[in-house]
Amino acid sequence: GLLNTFKDWAISIAKGAGKGVLTTLSCKLDKSC
């Protein structure tokens, strides 16, 4: 239902945001950006 759709959407956004943060952090640590 709607709640499940919303939950999946929130999870995928959280995953995407987490990946972005990890990429930025490793980039800054490695000075590779």
Curated annotation (Swiss-Prot):
InterPro entries: Antimicrobial_frog_2. Keywords: Amphibian defense peptide, Antibiotic, Antimicrobial, Disulfide bond, Secreted. It is found in: Secreted. It comes from the Eukaryota. The keyword Nucleotidyltransferase does not apply. Its main location: secreted. It holds the Pfam family Antimicrobial_2. Disulfide bonds join 27-33. Belongs to the frog skin active peptide (FSAP) family. Brevinin subfamily. Has antibacterial activity against Gram-positive bacteria. This is Rugosin-A. The lineage of its organism: Eukaryota, Metazoa, Chordata, Craniata, Vertebrata.
